[in-house]
């Protein structure tokens, strides 16, 4: 699934991804697939999976496009 980063707070390590076909999805820095400092930029296109988290759907396996 693809979407766009709505916002991401690097200090707190989380944010939201705007899906092309649905509701926004929570994203935690631990779901970002990259080495080193894991962060996302507002407006950045990403690809991701959706999994059921403790508080509802959240992004997993997030890859920057």
From Swiss-Prot:
It is found in: Cytoplasm. The keyword Manganese does not apply. Keywords: Activator, Cytoplasm, DNA-binding, Transcription, Transcription regulation. GO terms for molecular function: DNA binding; nucleic acid binding. GO terms for cellular component: cytoplasm. One of its GO terms (biological process) is regulation of gene expression. Pfam families: CSD (PF00313). It comes from the Bacteria. InterPro entries: Cold_shock_CspA, Cold_shock_domain, CSD, CSD_CS, CSP_DNA-bd, NA-bd_OB-fold. The keyword Transcription regulation applies. Residues 3-62 form the CSD domain. Homodimer. This is Cold shock-like protein CspC. It comes from Bacillus cereus (strain ATCC 14579 / DSM 31 / CCUG 7414 / JCM 2152 / NBRC 15305 / NCIMB 9373 / NCTC 2599 / NRRL B-3711).
